[in-house]
Amino acid sequence: MSATTTSASETSTPTCLPIPPKENGYVPPGGCGNIHMYEASFAAPVLFSVLFGLTTIIHIVQAIMFKKRYAWVVIMSSLWELIAFIMRSLFAKNQSSDAYNTPFTIFFLLAPIWVNAFLYMTLGRLIYFFLPSGRLGGIGAKRFGHIFVWLEILAFIIQLVGAAFTTDTEASQETIMRGVHIYMGGIGVQELFILIFTGLFIHLQRKMGEMERHGTLDAEKVGRGSMPWRWLFYAIYASLFLITVRIIFRLAQYADGTNIDNPALRNEWFEYVWDAAPIFICLAILNVAHPGRVLVGPDSEFPRVSRKEKKQRKREKKEAKIAEKEAKKERKRRRKHGSIGVDLLDAQERGSAPTSRPAPGGHGYQGENQRTWYDNRGNEVRP
């Protein structure tokens, strides 16, 4: 999130000074067209572009090598970071241009969410692979991933809305601060989900450790991996810790708003040390301790449903729904006729008529129109 001191609307008023920009486009605070309270470095974003580019390439290779389709999620995180720092490098040469600063801000702020989603999806696969029941805490493995990913999408949307407010060059200071508060709320929600997820992960580790002690943990599955399964847990804990460090920094950075005396807004290195570096280390850890080194084999992934099977299931669901509707209609029809009409309805369905006989007491009938019908219990039925 850029430490904007003046917006476009403010630059048209006498509150900003017509200070000529430097060769790289930088305008000091108070000058018309200023974006940051510091002069952005060129070397730092180039360095991080290289670092995130390397981890992106490695993650792509590992996704293919370990046959982990869901690894596209973590690739998105490193790719967004790469795009962010390419934009930052371009901005460093033209520091009065929002065309580079806005995409940098959005990609930089939102990229870590993809790492969270990847870890959540890994939890579901660990449950499915190692627990015979495929459940943890009464919840199915696949549902775990779905629940946390949707929660992460919620946090993503909140943060995106906040980031959009702060990058609006026409926004007032009040609007920018509203965006800051929305974004802080989004990362606060994200941290809450991380804490819940960490608790579940600890529960899974204890359960697997207990199974291992009792000899019920599948030794064949454990033996497939190229590293101990506990290493993956430690890597995930380290990743969650680094993401939490980054969240705490962001909360502290804007706790006092966009105060010009805030050192976190006046010094560029804060964002590199407490945001860019932790996320890079997190991605590098997942390169070293990739889930694909533990989750080995076709049974380490959720079963894939073919298009033909999906159509068949859809058709079966549709047929079941139609059958259920017909059953409901039948039940309503039977309730409407009451118990005395059950035999009559059954007879009609079989294509036969119910028994007709003279009325009790010797009274018969004289014509078809005056015929009286009775069911097997002797109750009169009016067809």
Curated annotation (Swiss-Prot):
Keywords assigned: Glycoprotein, Lipid transport, Membrane, Transmembrane, Transmembrane helix, Transport
Subcellular location: Membrane
A GO cellular component annotation in the UniProt record: membrane
Region of interest called Disordered, as start-end residue ranges on this chain: 305-383
Annotated knockout phenotype: Eliminates more than 70% of aspercryptin production.
Biased amino acid composition, Basic residues: 307-316
Record flagged with keyword Metal-binding: no
Alphabetical list of Pfam families matching this protein: RTA1
Membrane topology, from the record: Multi-pass membrane protein
Glycosylation site positions: 94
TM helices/strands, residue ranges: 46-66, 71-91, 104-124, 144-164, 182-202, 231-251, 269-289
Signal sequence residues: none
Record family assignment: Belongs to the lipid-translocating exporter (LTE) (TC 9.A.26.1) family.
Role: Probable lipid transporter; part of the gene cluster that mediates the biosynthesis of aspercryptins, linear lipopeptides built from six amino acids including 2 highly unusual and nonproteogenic amino acids, 2-amino-octanoic acid (2aoa) and 2-amino-dodecanol (2adol). The core structure of aspercryptins is as follows: Ser/Ala-Thr-Ile/Val-2aoa-Asn-2adol. The first step of aspercryptin biosynthesis is the generation of the fatty acid precursors, octanoic and dodecanoic acids, by the FAS subunits atnF and atnM.
Listed name of the protein: Probable lipid transporter atnI
